């Protein structure tokens, strides 16, 4: 029964549902073709048979339908691989002609499919798959033996932690004491600060959409985490605008509990993967690091924050932070930029019903239209937004508060609070002669066209002028 899927949905849209299992443990006993023949014999007329499932099952469904001269349509999506036809795995003979399932299908007339050829093609990958699986298992065994910088077995966790947030941030927890005792402060200070791997400069010049900073490896992150002295009064926390418990998430990285580190981050920050990339840590948390007082580089807090958030995302175990019970109070947020999203996340964790209103067609504000892909990929932002949705935050796009809907209307709809995070959408010109001439653009306009509207792509219809000589006024990040 556990292998039967979509039963309720199929039953709801069908006049009759027959379930067949080989051993009769659920539904009727017998293979699918037995059920088909039984149904055909009890009906006056059957127009068509549709078969979706394992290829061998679809073949015999076709043979059964042909026995009664009933047309049959099969879906061969089970043999598709890359979806482009380039790999050739789904190349088949359909009615004597070469077809690609992912391009020409996946639905075909079952009577035209050369099933024997199909099974042969599928069989050609069997030995290769078995060999690759052996290589993969060998790789896993190698990972299990891998050790970290201090020589102990590395706990490369991929399962969500069962420890509470209180246990993960407790400086007096036994695991935390053991970490402090394992290395002397002088040994930690002797470790050089990690260098973030970057794209090759020559290759970087050929792409504007690939992230320049490649992120830390597990080994690099653990080594950098060893540099943290786990101060009793951590000044780095005071330097963080949202007061992340920085030593706690770093120490969880040091012991190899990367998902636990992400949990600590998300207890305070709604956008750890974003902040790990674009926050000016050198002016905030890292500027308070005790290493600087000893004329040593600060702990790479931003790199480690990004690592923990990226590890959680890539592991597939994206967790929702601890949530307070719903209090029934509605709060509106104007703007879906970093301030709006952060506020929305904080209020959702406190139990409020949060609704974000965004003027543009995409959520993210400056994270989407202002920061280039090579520094902050949109896919990273989208994952953070999706996590907010899982927390219960609702979003409405193409809605200008004040025009599409007024604040009075929001209050009438029951919103008890309105947070305005509209950002700096309008540019500030200098008021000099000629600044309104053609081909002079504010940074807001340029970045919106290039980042959000993909103007640099010749296939899009968003206009942008490319000059031989370009003057840039301003030397900041923009």
Task: Report residues per predicted region.
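FNR/FR-type flavoprotein reductase catalytic core
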Residues: 1-81
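Glycine-rich FAD pyrophosphate-binding loop
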Residues: 352-368
